[in-house]
Amino acid sequence: MKISSRRLALRWWLAATISLGWLLAVGVAAAGPTGPSKYGMQPMTPAQAQAVRPAFVEVADIPALPRVLLIGDSISVGYTLAVRAQLAGRANVHRPSENCGSTGYGLERLETWLGAGPWAVIHFNFGLHDLKYLDAQGKYVAPEQGQQLVPVGEYEANLRKLVQRMQQTGAKIIFATTTPIPAGSAGRVEGSEQLYNAAAGRVMRAMKVAVDDLHAHALARQGTIQRPQNVHFTPAGSEELAGLVTQSILSELTP
């Protein structure tokens, strides 16, 4: 059957369009996540991440040792290197090469962070980014000028989903309570972590997850180890938190 030149041209156009679409899709997948999350975080390549923070450098496993995964925001980034040093020769301590942000971002990224495993222990926290207030441009603002990123009810529901997935790995799970918010912290309300820790406590009790109460320790030592008007800690403060994290991990690794 003879095909008209017009129909032949249409077939060529359709084939070219489909091929181009496939190539673009493959290219985007190969490139990985490049755009910011709706939760205000933006994944980096490993090279970019490692240039920003020494804690983001990937570690080589010692085969005979158990593998531990730390998941958390900048507070956990601050104690990662100390935990690695304290567990040297006893565990391979890994963490995602990024700030893990809020529970919403965690749901987007958890599969990537878990990777192929296996994990003996997963020590994690979410909270400080959930309870912050942002304006339409993503800037930290007072509560009356913006919206809370993840309201506490959504936070609690997100935690249940995150814990359920982590438990599927077979790892022992430890939740670290969210550390104190001092007066004057940008985009956050002093003491609001208490409401979020209460919600997290309900989830962890129901799902039988161990709790590392970093909040209680940090609150008792707040004037000494935490920066003023800032959720972050001094180097000595991060070292103290690392000691608590290390002990909680060892308690789960010990038969």
Task: Describe the role of every protein-language-model region.
Residues 1-69, 76-77, 81-92, 115-118, ...:
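N-terminal secretory targeting modules
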Residues 34, 62, 86-92, 105-255:
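Alpha-helical cap/lid subdomain in secreted, periplasmic
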Residues 53-56, 101-110:
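N-terminal post-signal-peptidase region of extra-cytosolic proteins
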Residues 70-71, 176:
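Short hydrophobic segments within beta-strands
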Residues 71-72, 122:
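Active-site beta-strand/loop signature of hydrolases that rely on acidic residues for catalysis
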Residues 73-74, 128:
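Active-site metal-binding loops of divalent metal-dependent hydrolases
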Residues 74-76, 100:
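Short beta->alpha connector loops
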Residues 95-101:
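Short beta->alpha junction loops
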